[in-house]
Amino acid sequence: MKFNKITITLIFFIFTSCSKPNLCPNFDFNTLEKITTLNNQPYTGRCSKYIDGKIRSIQQYLNGLDYGKWVFYYENGKIQTKGRFNKNGERIGVWRYFYSDGNRKQISKYSKLGERTGMWKVYNQDGDLIDLIDYN
């Protein structure tokens, strides 16, 4: 009996973790306060945007601010940009940018406070390193 409960619980978690996030509703964006709202309330949640059935972005918000992991996709399904935001809506950690063929374009780093930091790397379309920008 205990085995069945564990098995059912594991199956449930596998299916729910593989499901698509909710579709993003039509948000309002307050440009003065830089807050995303839904029905005049700051939005909190994870959602995704699709165009012509193809995923274009996965986004998260916390109290109307960009939050957590964000991923943007090209029309061909390849990743365009991926990175994270802190609870204040500022970019943090490593942000990666890619060309539409999947080759890396840029690697940027941000501190926990959202400040540019470290060595940023820029690549050409062939994947060759063409520029280094030092934010230390």
Give, region by region, the residue ranges found by the protein language model.
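N-terminal secretory signal peptides that target proteins for export/translocation
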Residues: M1-K2
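Sec-dependent N-terminal signal peptides
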Residues: K5-F15
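Glycine/tyrosine- and acidic-biased, solvent-exposed loop/turn segments at the edges of beta-strands
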Residues: T16-N136
